[in-house]
Curated annotation (Swiss-Prot):
Intracellular or extracellular location(s): Secreted
CDD domains linked to this entry: TIL (cd19941)
TIL domain ranges (all copies): 33-92
Name of this protein: Venom peptide SjAPI
Organism: Scorpiops jendeki
Gene Ontology MF: a single term: serine-type endopeptidase inhibitor activity
Amino acid sequence: MKWGALLCIFGFLAFCSVLDRGLGWIPDIWQKCSSKNEEFQQCGSSCPETCANHKNPEPKSCAAVCFVGCVCKPGFIRDDLKGSICVKPEDCSK
């Protein structure tokens, strides 16, 4: 599936969430995450902490928009250099 189509689907799901429709109608298979350190959230951060930004002392602005999908579980951050998997901060790629 193309990235544009995925973004469209997630945008629609976020819109439904804003309307307070909930995601009960989404098939369970769409709510499964591929990594053991991820979990599905209806309203995750659109600017999650990653290995690239977790040591950055400068605050960044982030839109207050829900991200619908798989996010890293608490205590884990995304490492884009390892295939975008969720790792403990001390295990980030150098």
